[in-house]
Amino acid sequence: MAPAQNPISSQHVVVIGAGAAGLVAARELSREGHTVVVLEREKEVGGLWIYSPKAESDPLSLDPTRSIVHSSVYESLRTNLPRECMGFTDFPFVPRFDDESRDSRRYPSHMEVLAYLQDFAREFNLEEMVRFEIEVVRVEPVNGKWRVWSKTSGGVSHDEIFDAVVVCSGHYTEPNVAHIPGIKSWPGKQIHSHNYRVPGPFENEVVVVIGNFASGADISRDIAKVAKEVHIASRASEFDTYEKLPVPRNNLWIHSEIDTAYEDGSIVFKNGKVVYADSIVYCTGYKYRFTFLETNGYMNIDENRVEHLYKHVFPPALSPGLSFVGLPSMGIQFVMFEIQSKWVAAVLSRRVTLPTEDKMMEDISAWYASLDAVGIPKRYTHKLGKIQSEYLNWVAEECGCPLVEHWRNQQIVRGYQRLVSHPETYRDEWDDNDLMEEAYEDFARKKLISFHPSHIL
């Protein structure tokens, strides 16, 4: 839409969550002139990047009375994209040579990502906006504004009114557990990757890992360091897939999907192979869930599609007072959070206008129809994949901010190609030095780094 003709408006906005999305949302809202309060349940900023050795009391996270742990980070986790493309556009995620405790690798550990987010919060004085150890209990629309009930870790309740709510609570807390015929009578151990931390508990076991992308690829190889055998069940594989991989201890196999589990401990794959397993690890993703949010029926979640959202951000009937930052998964997440946040901030200040409710609903219906036409299931509505660059550039144009850099887009493309073709080595061996050079020269030209690019290159 064209820039709005209305006078600039300052809103009182609450941001739910102080992870990467919440932090950059708070910054962009504040830059736009809004007053901002961030509500965060943890004791520090960082969201899902805060590692905890604790796991939930229910390893599958199905028991509604379980003790909930919000981190899904495992001890050995490293990023699956180069650090240059991960950072916010004006605060590069580059090595900190002034601190020997920091991880300077191009694909660093989860601890380095958390440290980067803490650096970002300090640089822009974001922590002064954050109320820590606050759980959001309920959010609902009231007379054109939003009422937010929350409580402290000590049980003290708060009831406040805001002009707008920006939901940045993430979507890595409610695990999705794949259905396996016969699993109820299967006698072995079961755990979702949300509760996986270290491989030790699987020593000398035969383990089946369901899922072979990102966490599945990582965790299967982590467990294979100590397990007797690890068998990966991959939905992306052909039905007759059966391949032995020589790493890390010549004890890792890739299969097609699981067909059935039996009470004698056996797992039968669709390729006909039978494995007697001790444990199953589900690396099968997560569900969107917003238990605190009351929208009077305007929104719902259907097969993991959050309905209805204009461009994955604004629910037409409740916009612009309610918005979501960070729903789409995969790709350049931090930059997506930043661009979406700029859009939300500009819309709330009336510097940019949204289409009418009817026009937004028409756009959503057309989007759903396009997914149906090519056979994409509802559960993949928020997986942008190859169209993420097009999506981000559209949002950037809406709010008048720069488009995503060429080098950043290409690092994503080539990074994922390496991940698929060389899952064992892609983090430490790469073939895109040209893109890394382009990135650091870009940082230097914009005066975003204090060292010469040759120090890295």
Curated annotation (Swiss-Prot):
What's the name of the protein?
Flavin-containing monooxygenase FMO GS-OX2
Loss of this gene results in the following: Increased accumulation of methylthiobutyl, -pentyl, -heptyl and -octyl glucosinolates in leaves and seeds.
Query: What is the recorded function of this protein according to its Swiss-Prot or TrEMBL entry?
Result: Catalyzes the conversion of methylthioalkyl glucosinolates of any chain length into methylsulfinylalkyl glucosinolates.
GO MF entries: 3-methylthiopropyl glucosinolate S-oxygenase activity; 4-methylthiopropyl glucosinolate S-oxygenase activity; 5-methylthiopropyl glucosinolate S-oxygenase activity; 7-methylthiopropyl glucosinolate S-oxygenase activity; 8-methylthiopropyl glucosinolate S-oxygenase activity; flavin adenine dinucleotide binding; N,N-dimethylaniline monooxygenase activity; NADP binding
What is the organism of origin for this protein? Arabidopsis thaliana
**What Enzyme Commission number(s) apply to this enzyme?**
1.14.13.237
The UniProt record gives the binding positions of FAD as G17, A18, G19, A20, A21, G22
By sequence similarity, the record places it as follows:
Belongs to the FMO family.
Q: Does the keyword Oxidoreductase apply?
A: yes
